[in-house]
A protein has these predicted regions:
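Conserved C-terminal "lid"/linker of ANL adenylate-forming enzymes
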Residues: 403, 428-431, 467-528
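Conserved ATP-binding/catalytic segment of the ANL
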Residues: 337-339, 344-346, 351-405, 422, ...
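Conserved pre-ATP/AMP-binding loop-to-beta segment of ANL
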Residues: 124-145, 152, 178-185
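ANL superfamily adenylate-forming
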Residues: 86-137, 247-276
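Structural core segment of the AMP-binding/adenylate-forming
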Residues: 24, 51-121, 447
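Conserved AMP-binding A3 loop
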Residues: 4-8, 141-167
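Conserved AMP-binding/adenylate-forming core of the ANL superfamily
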Residues: 1-39, 43, 47, 64-69, ...
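Conserved AMP-binding/adenylation subdomain of ANL enzymes
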Residues: 164-188, 192-272, 281, 306
Length: 528
């Protein structure tokens, strides 16, 4: 049973909430925190914060109590919205008793928040704000603490100019195939504090019109997606992998290949797959937040789903390059620079540098890091790559991810991990091996892999590893493939909130076993 708010109801509630916030006597440009899974109140609170002239500071809803306490202090947060979370019992004990809180209505399956002003009780005290704050483009819009794959989160300061400039992309290029008359259905399920969800889903919907639906829970995601059939769908590579493996679990690859060769049947199969995924009406399907293997893009293309590959980060408001899913020539790139973006490569380090109106003002209360990242107007992305003769950008890895073997050779993990993209028996692969003579690969099995007899699986993976190694220079050859026991999740900190592998945490979890694995004569091992 879906509950609906009209645009008028949403605007009325946001204006009342803005009036309430202004009545609290907060300092000018006060920092207002938000911690909640995606829901309508999140959007309304975000709008109200802007209308009141304050700065939003959203947090990942998966934060632990100590992490949130640190960010509330460091981010100088004056008031906190608490909503759809499952961890209030542990978080609440870390927040001072007198800290101002406004709590969203309780959602099924979430912990009851027992402190602060209740949402409707607070809002209904006020009349709608007549004259919302109108910011200057140079004003600070938001501070987003990145999840990061190493170290403490950094508070990225984005101005209204950065947000406003994103309209250039939609209006001039329209990679999302947005209908400017407002016929757009969006689904929101990736964390709203993540820059892509906020810009691509929330603000594109607000700017150009449409409806925005929220997934109830992870368990209901697949059904909700089928119900909504959005016009625009964005997913991290891990979600695309889940979709792919789900299809192959029902229709094995050989059978699928055969069916796709039959003209009439091929069209029916593609139509059915899209419907079952929830992508029948999708005008654009986009991947981002982490690298997607070219083999996966090509696989989806064969079943009629054309994935646009986008490259960006919080520091540039998710705007840098993109390659359309129908651009067959450059599937292994992340595309050409977007309108208003300049990209170049540092000749010494091969680091990707970019500039444009979308770039952050800096890192909150971290002048040293700001100066190291923003140099003469150029954002140093931390990614390594190159531009081809047609100005298409290719990402080869992270500057900080490179590691040196005991032979003194540097390894770029991402370039090796991409070789495993066609192996459907594996769900996730991480190349590592600092200090070993050769790199090793850690992997977790997919449901397809788990269904195979152990000896058959080992034999198959030994063949695949040998095939991969024939394409590699000697120093890059992978000595061992280890199938890990524990599932990699956000809970055990191997994956971040945006489903990227946190390599530092992988090192912490497994590094003591590296030497033994490498010295084992077998090339495919199960972790004991």
């Amino acid at each position: 049973q879906w509950e609906e708010y009209t645009w008028a109801e949403t605007g009325q509630m946001a204006r009342k909430l803005a009036a309430g916030l202004k009545s609290l006597g907060l300092r000018d440009n006060a920092h207002i925190g938000l911690i909640s899974k995606n829901c309508r109140e999140w959007i309304i609170a975000d709008l109200a914060i802007m209308m009141a002239g304050y700065v939003s500071v959203p947090f990942f809803p998966s934060l632990k109590g100590e992490e949130l306490k640190y960010l509330l202090d460091f981010g100088d947060v004056d008031l906190l919205f608490v909503g759809k979370i499952e961890t209030w019992d542990s978080i609440g004990t870390r927040i001072p008793e007198d800290f101002p809180i406004i709590r969203f209505p309780q959602y099924k399956g979430c912990t009851a928040v027992d402190r602060g002003e209740q949402w409707f009780d607070f809002i209904n005290q006020f009349q709608p704000l007549i004259k919302p704050h109108v910011p200057k483009l140079s004003d600070l819009w938001t501070i987003i603490f990145t999840s990061g794959t190493t170290g403490n989160p950094k508070g990225v300061e984005l101005s209204y100019l950065a947000l406003d400039s994103t309209k250039i992309i939609t209006e001039q290029v329209n990679p999302l195939k947005v209908d400017f008359s407002g016929n757009n259905d969006f689904i929101s399920y990736l964390p709203l504090n993540h820059i892509v969800e906020r810009v691509v889903v929330e603000h594109v919907c607000m700017r150009f019109g449409g409806s925005l639906s929220f997934v109830e829970s992870i368990d209901s995601f697949a059904q909700n997606l089928k119900d909504i059939q959005p016009h625009v769908f964005f997913a991290a590579p891990r979600i695309w992998t889940k979709f792919q493996l789900g299809i192959l679990a029902k229709v094995p690859q050989k059978k699928l290949d055969l069916l796709l060769k039959i003209p009439v049947i091929s069209g029916l199969i593609k139509k059915k797959l899209k419907k079952n995924l929830g992508l029948t009406r999708a005008r654009s399907t986009v991947s981002g937040s982490a690298p997607i293997p070219v083999a996966q893009i090509e696989w989806f293309r064969k079943v009629g789903i054309y994935i646009t590959n986008g490259y960006g980060m919080t520091e540039n408001c998710a705007i840098c390059t993109q390659v359309d899913g129908r651009d067959f020539r450059k599937s292994d790139s992340v595309g050409k620079p977007q309108c208003g973006v300049d990209v170049k490569i540092d000749p010494k380090t091969q680091e990707v540098l970019m500039r444009g109106p979308f770039v952050m003002d800096g890192y909150y209360k971290n002048e040293k890091m700001t100066k190291a990242t923003l140099i003469n107007g150029w954002l140093h992305t931390g990614d390594k790559g190159y531009l081809d003769k047609d100005n298409y950008l290719y990402i080869t890895g992270r500057v900080v991810d490179s590691f040196k073997t005991s032979k003194g050779k540097f390894i770029e993990p991402l370039s090796l991990e991409n070789y495993f993209g066609t192996i459907k028996e594996l769900e996730e692969v991480c190349i590592t091996g600092l200090g070993l003579p050769q790199p090793i690969a850690l992997a977790q099995l997919s449901e397809i892999g788990k269904a195979l007899p152990k000896e058959e699986l080992i034999g198959f993976l030994e063949e695949k590893l040998a095939e991969i190694n024939t394409d590699l220079a000697n120093y890059k050859k992978i000595s061992t493939l280890i199938l890990v026991k524990e599932q990699w999740t956000e809970q055990n900190k191997v994956l971040g909130p945006t489903l990227k592998i946190k390599r530092g945490n992988v090192e912490e979890m497994y590094s003591k076993k590296y030497k033994g694995w490498h010295e084992d004569r077998r090339t495919v091992l199960f972790e004991k």
